[in-house]
A protein has these predicted regions:
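Walker A (P-loop) phosphate-binding motif
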Residues: 145-187, 308-314
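Short helix immediately C-terminal to the catalytic nucleophile in hydrolase catalytic domains
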Residues: 168, 172, 322, 348-349, ...
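Switch II (G3) loop of P-loop NTPases
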Residues: 199-215, 453-457
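Conserved catalytic-core segment of NTP-binding enzymes
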Residues: 207-284, 288, 484
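Non-catalytic peripheral regions of patatin-like phospholipases
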Residues: 254-257, 262-273, 277-280, 291-293, ...
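Helix-rich "cap/lid" substructures immediately adjacent to catalytic or cofactor-binding pockets
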Residues: 292-339
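Catalytic nucleophile loop
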Residues: 313, 335-354
């Protein structure tokens, strides 16, 4: 296929020009010039004159912008058949963003002179196209457009024997559940455009790199959308030759970068994860076990934006309904890739992230909740919180949030700054404690001088925190992954005898002991309601951010009804099974 034929093929597939007649398309193709650019090349700098527009013939471009803070944000990808720069060309405005080749690419260029010549030949047809293009842009602005194209990954070993070949093979197996996969082994005889044919035939391309900065490794890197570095758990964290060389590639900042820490299959908990944080700009660090295909399936879902995050809200004993919902998700083979929670949801979620059986979680949680708490001088809080802290330390030991195969976070409220504080690192017991410290009832947990309490003050079901963790730091998009939120909080309005002018301690005590007096709220009721009113008022916003929002009918159970854990879990199970059946009839959630 010669360049003219390739240009025609691209134009026919174009969303902007595809509806034009063959005569106009042939004229347009004859006015195009072609250029080959290497991955990482900046082809249209922000602020430069808009003297041309580009069509992608092969490869791909990426639109990006530096924010005032200096952070890099990635926007649309421009793939074969698509164009970029038409708005600036038509309106004669400077470029509003950088456009960079993310792969070795062949581009067709329409210069301003050619554009004006074509307008004189076909004024009505082309003006109609350009007016529609401007209208669409003014109506919707610059948006991230979801497109179907082959996603590509390069698996790079950071040292000899890192296990990149096993990671690439296991990732290929996992991705085959989502589409067609081709796994490229290292090769030295590849032609410059050898990969173009695979773009249209496969959904996922995996390039297996070498532990050296060979020509194959560099070429594979340039073709990849995402980079997966691989190291053995416990390996040196020093920057090696291959990482240093790839870091010098002009397209390095544009790539989404991940780290896989490969562990022996018999490892009970990950090691070394926390020590890698902050050393590199990795989007995520994935501790994976050799031979555990479920770990690689989770990796595949994160890479492709199809991961499932489950958010567990607070609600005292009603939180046992979470166990029923989790059981239903497991039985329906729905993936749970990331767990987050607040208060009781954090306590259950942390144990679930430890891979404990659901029955064990219920029994451990019931024992934990049955312990009393000693009142203290009410200067900071009503109770000391020492028993809860002691038992959480016993429950989780020396585990940190990083020491989990399944990612987890606990949500708390930072009273010092008035924001949600996501606990996704450090001791696991401490993260759960901060999320289970209602303001006024328990003393706040201190973090570098700031006060952390139960997160329900701001958001009892921390969906926003989950959305941020399912998204990617570089890309501006909302749609990554699926969020299943479980809300077990029951809004009960506080009231007192309408004939009273003020609450009475003695009347409240009489009501507590069942003397027949009109029940008046006690300090525990007041503090609990005050701590949940913010989250309750934002429930509509929280629901809108979740893909599936479950509210098991647990109002009949008391906040402190921990002895009814089996009944509560069963209610959650039956409720979830009914709703999951409705989901699967519409849009099925991601399977494991």
């Amino acid at each position: 296929m010669n360049l003219h034929e390739r240009a025609l093929k691209v134009l026919r597939a174009s969303q902007v020009f595809g509806a034009l007649g063959e005569v106009i398309l042939n004229d347009l193709a004859r006015h195009l010039t072609f250029q080959n650019v290497r991955g990482g090349t900046l082809v249209l700098p922000e602020g430069s004159a808009s003297d041309s527009m580009l069509f992608v013939v092969t490869g791909g471009l990426r639109v990006s912008r530096r924010e005032p803070s200096g952070a890099l944000s990635l926007y649309n990808e421009v793939r074969p058949g698509q164009s970029v720069g038409e708005i600036g060309l038509i309106l004669q405005q400077p470029r509003t963003a950088d456009v960079t080749a993310v792969r070795d690419s062949c581009l067709a260029v329409l210069s301003r002179a050619s554009y004006e010549a074509l307008l004189s030949l076909h004024p009505l047809a082309l003006n109609r196209v350009f007016v529609q293009t401007i209208h669409d842009f003014m109506s919707h602005g610059a948006q991230v457009v979801q497109q179907h194209y082959a996603q590509s990954f390069v698996v790079v070993p950071l040292h000899d024997g890192a296990g990149a070949d096993e990671v690439a093979a296991s990732l290929a197996t996992a991705l085959r559940r989502q589409g067609r996969v081709h796994h490229f082994k290292p090769r030295l005889d590849a032609e410059p455009d050898w990969h173009d044919d695979f773009e249209g035939r496969f959904d996922f391309l995996i390039y297996e790199a070498q532990a050296s900065a060979s020509s194959w490794t560099r070429r594979a890197f340039r073709q990849a959308d995402q980079v997966i570095f691989v190291a053995q758990a416990g390996a040196s964290q020093a920057i090696g030759v291959v990482e240093q060389r790839l870091g010098e590639e002009p397209g390095f900042p544009m790539k989404r970068k991940h780290l896989v820490l490969l562990h022996p299959s018999s490892m009970l908990a990950p090691v070394g994860v926390a020590s890698w944080r902050g050393l590199r700009e990795f989007e995520r660090i994935y501790p994976l076990r050799q031979g555990h295909q479920a770990d690689f399936s989770r990796l595949a879902r994160f890479l492709t934006g199809t991961a499932v995050g489950v958010v567990l809200g607070g609600g005292g004993a009603r939180g046992f309904a979470h166990l029923g919902v989790l059981r239903a998700l497991q039985e329906c083979d729905i993936a749970i890739d990331l767990v987050g929670g607040n208060s009781m949801g954090a306590l259950i979620g942390a144990q679930y992230a430890c891979d404990l059986a659901l029955d064990d979680i219920r029994e451990r949680t019931q024992r934990f909740a049955s312990g009393g708490e000693r009142p203290t001088l009410p200067v900071i809080s009503l109770v000391s919180g020492r028993r809860v802290e002691r038992d959480l330390k016993r429950m989780f030991g020396d585990l940190t949030v990083d020491d989990l195969w399944r990612p987890f976070f606990a949500a708390a409220c930072n009273l010092s700054r008035g924001v949600t504080a996501v606990q996704d690192s450090g001791p696991l017991w401490r993260a759960v404690l901060a999320s289970n410290s209602p303001a006024g009832l328990f003393p706040p947990v201190l973090s570098r001088g700031e006060l952390l309490v139960d997160g329900a003050i701001l958001e009892n079901v921390p969906v926003q925190a989950m959305r941020e963790r399912l998204g990617t730091p570089l890309e501006k998009r909302r749609g990554n992954g699926t969020i299943i939120a479980i809300d077990v909080d029951v809004r009960v309005g506080l009231s007192a005898d309408p004939n009273l002018e003020r609450l009475s301690v003695w009347r409240t005590l009489k009501g507590f002991f069942g003397s027949g007096a009109h029940p008046s709220p006690g300090i525990g009721d007041i503090l609990y309601s005050a701590g949940h009113v913010g989250g309750a008022n934002r429930r509509a916003q929280t629901m809108a951010k979740a893909d599936h929002y479950l509210q098991p009918p647990v109002a009949e159970f008391a906040l402190m009804g921990y002895r009814r854990s089996r009944e509560i879990a069963e209610v959650g199970y039956r409720y979830a099974m009914e709703h999951i059946e409705q989901w699967t009839q519409a849009t099925p959630p991601t399977k494991r």
